[in-house]
């Protein structure tokens, strides 16, 4: 069952032909069709799941090599996409502007401007959003050992932690709390700095208290 899930996730990483792009899913009718726009949730769940597979006993050397390549591809894709000209967002598979894929903001100190639907479409980041990007780079570093990814992780991690530590309203969606938890858990597992690891641990405790 786990290996079947892995093969399905791997297909989502390969179907577009764009290294690092993760499709939401693949059409069961032909095994080729997919939606051009992905989402931050899709990428985050993929990265978290693939690192878990990488560390699982079922993963042989070939599987771990495949996972390492996919996670590094995601990190490269994020590095290329998450820049000012793209509104700090992951792009669609065709290279056009996306929706629900904003990964960072010009000023991490700016407060988010939340609309009537509860989304922060402009301004700063919400607590559950802020650790996705460093999580991608942490996973790439964990499987490759390439210091470049650790450097990129740390470029965003401390601001991300500070934002995640801000008060979270009781109306937070369960899916949002879950996204925060999986990002923080991956970062906590990978972190070697004692002070930063302790802050991640406190964030995990808060997620548990709110669940």
What residue spans do the PLM features occupy?
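Well-ordered alpha-helical scaffold segments within catalytic/enzyme domains
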Residues: 1, 45-63, 132-146, 180-196
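Boundary/linker segments of alpha-helical solenoid repeat arrays
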Residues: 15-20, 166-170, 211
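Extended ligand-binding groove/face enriched in aromatic
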Residues: 1-122
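Alpha-solenoid helical-repeat scaffolds
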Residues: 33-43, 61, 65, 123-127, ...
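Extended, charged low-complexity segments
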Residues: 170, 174-211
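Beta-propeller domains
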Residues: 122-180
